[in-house]
């Protein structure tokens, strides 16, 4: 596991400067859902095995990463009232999890992917040498939906799989916490186990996404003249091919039809 900064936040909850710098220009686990986001394919596209169009979320995230790599300035994100509430109670959720599971959760900073330095994750906590936690403090309606559904929500699985890949873990617990509910309903925990097929598919998508960002940088150079990336960014984003990642040609072509092997 390659941890490059020890803390995500200061005691007052504000982001740690080292953590922000570590993330800037890198593809992060919290945005893997955007990396994997495509428009729903038509029947004709499925029959012809044509890759679906990118969603606007994927396009927007590519532009965000491009801006960060050209400027070394982290993107600004709006923090809503519910998000502030969640941040305030995340430590409580972590403690409740520790009590229920009779274990300890270690906090960490930014962890690089095992195979490439231009991507990584910031786990909400590590559990021993094999596990992690993904903590959410949602509104009550959403939390009750998790309790009644009794499954790991699909929208968080890509992030959790990628965190397991980065940290070389066997499992990750999805944790939802709502301090407003009666005690038996406050905490929901559901475990997601490592799935090699899903993990390698996501790794392939991350490679393709990074290549597309680099393609835009190359296009700007060709149109407007050569330039260098900021020094603190250049070391993070060296191009990487698919070799050594344990991904088969078939898996790569599923996300990158142009791949020739």
Predicted regions span which residues?
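Accessory terminal regions of nucleic-acid processing enzymes
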Residues: 1-261
């Amino acid at each position: 596991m390659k941890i490059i900064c020890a803390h995500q936040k200061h005691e007052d909850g504000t982001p740690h400067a080292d953590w922000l710098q570590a993330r800037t220009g890198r593809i992060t686990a919290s945005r893997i859902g955007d990396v994997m986001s495509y428009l729903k394919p038509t029947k004709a596209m499925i029959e012809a095995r044509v890759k679906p169009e990118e969603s606007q979320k994927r396009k927007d995230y590519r532009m965000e990463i491009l801006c960060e790599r050209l400027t070394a300035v982290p993107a600004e994100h709006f923090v809503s009232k519910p998000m502030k509430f969640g941040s305030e109670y995340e430590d409580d959720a972590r403690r409740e999890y520790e009590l229920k599971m009779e274990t300890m959760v270690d906090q960490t900073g930014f962890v690089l992917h095992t195979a490439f330095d231009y991507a990584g994750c910031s786990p909400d906590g590590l559990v021993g040498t094999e596990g992690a936690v993904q903590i959410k403090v949602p509104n009550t309606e959403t939390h009750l939906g998790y309790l009644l559904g009794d499954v790991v929500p699909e929208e968080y699985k890509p992030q959790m799989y990628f965190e397991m890949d980065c940290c070389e873990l066997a499992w990750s617990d999805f944790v939802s916490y709502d301090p407003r509910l009666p005690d038996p309903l406050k905490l929901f925990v559901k475990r997601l186990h490592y799935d090699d097929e899903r993990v390698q598919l996501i790794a392939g998508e991350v490679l393709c996404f990074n290549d597309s960002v680099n393609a835009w940088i190359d296009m700007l150079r060709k149109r407007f003249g050569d330039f260098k990336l900021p020094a603190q960014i250049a070391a993070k984003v060296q191009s990487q091919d698919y070799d050594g990642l344990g991904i088969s040609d078939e898996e790569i072509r599923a996300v990158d039809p142009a791949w020739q092997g």
